[in-house]
Each structure stands twice: as C-alpha cells, then as structure tokens.
C-alpha cells in the first residue's frame, strides 16, 4: 500500500485525481463541504440530467436500505450507475472504494447522499486510547446513522449513564507515568470513553454526544449543541456554527456565514431551521461573525472540532449581551 497526503484542502481533488486512492479518511467537516459543493452543482442541472440525478438519489437510498428494486427501477439504476455515479467517482480518481469518516459525528443525510450518489462513505469511531479504531460500518451493510459494529478484537458495552465502554487488546495499558489519570478512565479492564451512545439490535454503535459537551438548560433539560450545530451547517448559507446555552433559559448561536446582501436573509434561514427543531433546541438569537473558526486562531482542534472554551472566552462579552 501507498499513503498520500493532500497538499491542501484547495488542491484535494487534483491530488486525488493524481493519486487515484482506494480508501480515503477525513473528518466530517470535509464531507459536509463536499456535500454542499456537489449539491449546489447538481441543483444547476435541468431537464433530463436533473431527472436522472433525482432518480440516482432515490434509488441509491433505496439500495442503501436493502430494499428490492423492481424491473423498471433496475433499468433506470443501470443508467444512473453509468451516467451519474461513475462520472462522479471519476472526479476522485476513479478507484475509490470508500470514504472513511471519523473524528466526529457525520450527519445522517450527508451519509445517505454520498452513498447514494456513488461515493461509498463509511462512518467509524475510535480514540487514541484504543489505538485508535473501535468500530466502523461494513461496506455491504452501511447504517449511516451509526459508526458500525465493534471490530473483532473489541467488546463494547453501555454504562448506566449512557457512556460507551470499550475492552480489547487494542486498549492502552495506561497513560505513561500518570496512574491517577489512568485509573479514572480504565476500570476493571474497561476504557471509559467519555462518549454517550447506544447499541442497536444488529450490534451497530450509535454515538449521541460527548459526555462533557452536553448542555443543561435552566429547566434541567439535556441538550446536544453538536447535534444542532450539524443541522445548522447543512444549510448552504451557514459555514460554521457554535451553539451556546448551558445553564441559560434559551439557546443562542455564533454563525460564520457565506456573504449575503443583508443579515435578514440569515434570520429567515434560521426561522426555517428552527421549525424542524424541538422547542428547547431552537436558536433564539444569533451573532454573525466574519472570522472563521480555524486551527490558527485556536478555535478548532487539529481534527477540526470546535474548541468550546476558547470560543466562549473570545466571544463572552457578546454572548452575555444576548441574555
């Protein structure tokens, strides 16, 4: 095997065309951007092309759910495979067998879209203390709202409070020279991951949140900021989102947006998103900022996750004004 590293995000597609990878790993934000760009391009199509793309998505989702295609659907899907999926796959080198997503939650409709359009996308889960992979979806049975079944070398169980526990030969012996810290996360051979999740009837693991990231509002309700942030970022006008509201009576958000003529456009977008959220999850007020969250300004981790404490520290004064 050979390993290739992309020169930059901007040069990723040309790099993939040169390298012709069979497997590629990336964090969810990459797939989120990819979803937005492909979607915007597909929306420009008209006539027969538009109908064919719509059928590609409809039939792709049907196959993803292991539903049988009738005779007519099989013929249409044959056309979709050769006229749509193969062409899209060729843009990524032509040999791609799977995208692997890890390092955070991949939104379900992004996973469905990419798999349906001809880009097999498998979501997995792991952490450094588990060397680092715990589970991953299987190519022949993809459940996009999960991170797949545990590897054969692993065992997974869910603690009473919902925390995911992992045991196996890949789990670390401990933190070097830090017995006290080790004892906090390894008990009776089980690694306490700090993630909250559940296991379905097929043994597929579903991550619901990071234990330390769950917010509790003034009413005592548990709220997942990352879930709401992912939903916000599905909109083509919202590039990044940070949701805030721990120990508050409503939620607010900091949004990094695409350039729009006026802020009222973003407010209309937010109103539409709020309609599909539970009452306690709705965003009441927003701050629109120009500066993106990046690794360089210390708002993102190296795996492109939000550094919540750093963002709160930088915007505390403006956040407080929203309450």
Each model region followed by its residue ranges:
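Conserved AMP-binding/adenylate-forming
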Residues: 24, 64, 80-205, 211-214, ...
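Residue-level signal for well-ordered alpha-helical positions
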Residues: 15, 37-38, 178, 218, ...
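AMP-binding/adenylate-forming catalytic core of the ANL superfamily
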Residues: 158, 168, 173-174, 196-297
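Short acidic loop-to-helix transition motifs that present clustered carboxylates
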Residues: 8-12, 105-106, 128-130, 221
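Acidic/polar alpha-helix N-cap and adjacent early helical turns
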Residues: 297, 315-323
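Conserved AMP-binding/adenylation subdomain of ANL enzymes
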Residues: 1-82, 95
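Alpha-helix/helix-capping structural signal
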Residues: 10, 29, 104-105, 170, ...
């Amino acid at each position: 095997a050979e390993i290739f590293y992309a020169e930059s995000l901007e040069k990723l597609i040309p790099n993939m065309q040169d390298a012709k990878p069979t497997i590629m790993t990336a964090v969810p934000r990459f797939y989120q951007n990819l979803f937005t760009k492909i979607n915007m391009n597909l929306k420009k199509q008209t006539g027969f092309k538009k109908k064919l793309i719509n059928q590609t998505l409809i039939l792709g989702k049907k196959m993803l759910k292991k539903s049988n295609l009738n005779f007519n659907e099989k013929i249409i899907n044959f056309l979709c495979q050769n006229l749509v999926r193969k062409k899209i796959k060729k843009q990524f080198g032509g040999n791609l067998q799977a995208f692997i997503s890890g390092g955070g939650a991949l939104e379900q409709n992004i996973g469905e879209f990419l798999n349906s359009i001809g880009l097999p996308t498998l979501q997995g889960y792991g952490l450094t203390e588990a060397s680092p992979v715990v589970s991953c979806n299987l190519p022949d049975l993809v459940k996009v709202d999960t991170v797949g079944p545990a590897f054969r070398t692993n065992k997974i169980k869910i603690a009473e409070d919902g925390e995911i526990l992992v045991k196996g030969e890949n789990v670390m012996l401990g933190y070097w020279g830090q017995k006290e810290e080790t004892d906090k996360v390894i008990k009776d051979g089980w690694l306490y991951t700090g993630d909250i999740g559940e296991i379905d009837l097929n043994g597929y693991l579903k991550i619901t949140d990071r234990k330390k990231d769950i917010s509790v509002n003034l009413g005592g309700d548990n709220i997942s900021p990352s879930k709401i942030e992912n939903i916000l970022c599905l909109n083509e006008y919202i590039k990044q989102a940070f949701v805030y509201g721990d120990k508050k009576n409503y939620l607010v958000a900091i949004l990094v947006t695409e350039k729009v003529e006026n802020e009222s456009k973003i407010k209309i977008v937010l109103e539409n998103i709020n309609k599909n959220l539970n009452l306690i999850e709705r965003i009441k007020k927003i701050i629109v900022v120009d500066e993106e969250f990046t690794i360089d300004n210390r708002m993102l981790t190296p795996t492109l996750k939000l550094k919540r404490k750093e963002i709160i520290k930088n915007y505390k004064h403006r956040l407080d004004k929203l309450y």
